[in-house]
Each structure stands twice: as C-alpha cells, then as structure tokens.
Amino acid sequence: MLSSTLRVAVVCVSNVNRSMEAHSILRRKGLSVRSFGTESHVRLPGPRPNRPVVYDFATTYKEMYNDLLRKDRERYTRNGILHILGRNERIKPGPERFQECTDFFDVIFTCEESVYDTVVEDLCSREQQTFQPVHVINMEIQDTLEDATLGAFLICEICQCLQQSDDMEDNLEELLLQMEEKAGKSFLHTVCFY
C-alpha cells in the first residue's frame, strides 16, 4: 500500500466537463484530487458549432453560469452546460490552468492526446527540483456528458487500484494493460520528474 494518499490531477482542455466530472467522482471517493485545463481560454459550446462562448480562465464558474443564463437559458439548459457549471461551482470556484500549478502529483490523467502532449511538454520544461516521479496517463475521453462520466469511473477504478498497490511503480504498467483489456481503451503513459 502507498504510504501516503495518492495525489491525483485530471486534465482536459478547459477544466469544465471531463476533468471536473472525474474531480467530482474522485473527491466523493475520498481521493486527493485537483483538476485543470491546458488551453489559453475556456471554450464552451456556443450558438453555432464554429462559434464557441469563450471565457478567460480567471472567470468563475458562477460568472459563466450567470452569463449563459442571461444569453439563452433554454439552450444552455438543454445542452447540459448550466448543469455542468452548477456542479463545478460546488467543487471549486473556477477553472485552473495546469501550466500555472506548482503542486506535485503522483499521477496525472489527461483526457485527450493533445492535452497529454501539453502536460508532458510542460513538465519536461520545468526545472527539476526533487526528482520525484509523476506518472502521466492519457485516456481518450470524448467531450460528452456520458463519456465524461464513464471515463471518470475508469479513472477512479485505476486510482483505487493504485491506492491499494504495494508498489505503484512496479504495478502500474500491468494495471494499465488489464484496464485496456477490460475497457477496450488504450492508454499512453510516461514518467516525468519534478
């Protein structure tokens, strides 16, 4: 068993749907978790597919909620965005960018390959301080409500297995292979150092 609580981060593009659904589920299971986005702005579905609603990362979930409520309550209720923002507000005030976080994690889950690339690049560009390893694992999760929930449960299952592991470093690869077979998903995995 790990000697201390597993420190987990979940990262998607905007820190709104996939990472926050995982954050919600992992937190309910008692895990130490934070969530992040990697883009320069938060982008939410807008009135047309090519016209997203764009917010700065400093905008709180409550401010986004109120803005969308004012713009088109029916549309943003129907597409689930108001529900998502309400859930997010109960977890933390607003979205956070991974690149601005200086905390250390044992495992970082990313929800798409481009986010994985950004996280790995960011970690590799930082000056190494402690040489503590951090496992970065990518699992492709479509940015839909249903897929975010399914992905969050799979991330939770992996975290619970790691939390119970006698040696995370030795058991992680085997665990990921088992999860690939079970879930029919493939994972990218690398180790970076703080």
Swiss-Prot record:
Classification via InterPro entries: Ptyr_pPase_sf, RNA_pol_II_suA
Gene Ontology molecular function, alphabetical: RNA polymerase II CTD heptapeptide repeat phosphatase activity
EC number: 3.1.3.16
Compartment(s): Nucleus
GO CC terms in record: mRNA cleavage and polyadenylation specificity factor complex
Catalytic activity, reaction form: O-phospho-L-seryl-[protein] + H2O = L-seryl-[protein] + phosphate; O-phospho-L-threonyl-[protein] + H2O = L-threonyl-[protein] + phosphate
Domain of life, per lineage: Eukaryota
Keywords on record: Hydrolase, mRNA processing, Nucleus, Protein phosphatase
Single Gene Ontology BP annotation: mRNA processing
Enzyme type, top EC level: hydrolase
Signal peptide feature range: none
Similarity comment text for this entry: Belongs to the SSU72 phosphatase family.
Function of the protein: Protein phosphatase that catalyzes the dephosphorylation of the C-terminal domain of RNA polymerase II. Plays a role in RNA processing and termination.
Name of the protein this chain belongs to: RNA polymerase II subunit A C-terminal domain phosphatase SSU72 like protein 1
Species of provenance: Homo sapiens (Human)
